[in-house]
Regions:
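Hydrophobic alpha-helical transmembrane segments of membrane transport/permease proteins
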Residues: 15-66, 83, 159-180
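Alpha-helical transmembrane segments of integral membrane proteins
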Residues: 2-4, 16, 91-128, 144, ...
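Short hydrophobic, aromatic-rich alpha-helical segments embedded in or entering the lipid bilayer
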Residues: 43-76, 213, 262-273
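Membrane-water interface segments at the C-terminal ends of transmembrane alpha-helices
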Residues: 22-29, 59, 70, 134-165, ...
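N-terminal signal-anchor/signal peptide hydrophobic helix marking the start
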Residues: 6-12
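Membrane-water interface at transmembrane helix exits
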Residues: 23, 27, 31, 35, ...
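An internal, D/E-rich "acidic patch" concept
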Residues: 58-114
Length: 313
């Protein structure tokens, strides 16, 4: 078991190292100069050179990468060029909306996707199966910004049940902040439920064809007991896997939704940083998102090793 954990941990570190290199290279490959954006068109060449030296942007790229990587290994993601404060602080200040949005969205996606996938598998080939399969295909093809605009128009503008945008003041009650996240979480939840529906359906179909399920039915057990106690229990591990990965994908994919709804989350911070060419924020945010994704994937691998005897450790 320890060898299995060590090999997975080593693989995780390799992935993060590759991500760090790619993030740095792609950020620097983008056109534009953060110092020019910061100082404006009236800045002189001397002013630009002075600020570039202050942030180490006058050094060769390999040297810049070495400095940045050394700071990252010490837990320092750098200082934002525009916000003038540590990137870790900026990310922490924006983490609450994004985290709550992802958790609410995955709860909605799971509450919709798992039951629909189970029903679709049980009634394979029937009208309800075709209906849920069609809904899953539709959900996978609808752009999040379009669905967000539609929900805003209906539930925020027409009915006035939810705010059009924003997250509330920092000192606003927690319930008020959650209320502001209902529409964006619904957008992400509905769209990501499509993946969970398809995955749950496929997992349940694999299990429903097993001998022990047929044996349970031959014993006269009710269909609900067969499906929920025998089939779902054995199909649950891969379903939990896709739900866990959905959490990571939502954290990284909330950029568009946060922009549409004007949420002050990490996604909105990244968009602003990209427009300003704020290298430290872009690099730090993407590296943290990648680390969260890799850690969730690592945890799921360990879960597999514990509960699934077919996984060799």
């Amino acid at each position: 078991m320890l060898r299995y954990i060590a090999s997975r941990a080593a693989g995780m570190l390799v992935v993060l190292a590759i991500v760090a290199v790619l993030v740095f290279v792609l950020t620097r490959a983008a056109s534009g100069d953060p110092v020019s954006v910061l100082l404006g068109d009236q800045a002189t060449a001397a002013d630009i050179a002075r600020v570039q030296k202050e942030y180490g942007l006058d050094k060769p790229l390999p040297v810049q990468f070495g400095y940045w990587l050394r700071e990252v290994l010490q837990g320092n993601l750098g200082t934002s060029i525009f916000l003038q404060r540590p990137v870790t602080q900026a990310l922490w200040e924006r983490s609450e909306p994004t985290t709550l949005l992802a958790l609410m969205a995955v709860a909605i996606a799971a509450l919709i996707g798992v039951p629909c996938g189970i029903v679709s598998a049980v009634f394979r080939g029937r009208v309800v199966d075709q209906l849920f399969t069609g809904i899953a295909m539709l959900g996978a093809s609808i752009p999040s910004f379009w669905l967000g605009i539609v929900l805003i128009q209906i539930f925020a503008v027409s009915f006035g049940w939810f705010p059009v945008s924003g997250y509330g003041a920092p000192d606003a009650p927690f319930a008020e902040r959650l209320h502001a996240l209902v529409l964006p979480a619904t957008v992400l939840g509905l769209l990501n439920s499509a993946l969970i529906i398809r995955f749950t359906r496929a997992s349940m179909l694999d299990v429903l064809g097993e001998d022990y399920v047929r044996t349970a039915r031959s014993k006269g057990l009710s269909e609900s007991v067969v499906v929920l106690k025998h089939a779902l229990r054995n199909a649950l591990v891969p379903i939990v896997t896709v739900i866990g990965l959905t959490v990571a994908l939502m954290i990284g994919g909330a950029v568009i939704t946060e922009t549409v709804f004007g949420l002050p989350g990490v996604g909105n911070l990244v968009v602003s940083a990209v427009l300003r060419r704020d290298y430290p924020v872009i690099q730090g945010a993407l590296l943290v998102i990648a680390a969260i994704y890799v850690l969730i994937n690592f945890s799921i691998d360990l879960l597999y090793a514990v509960v699934d005897p077919r996984v060799k450790v």
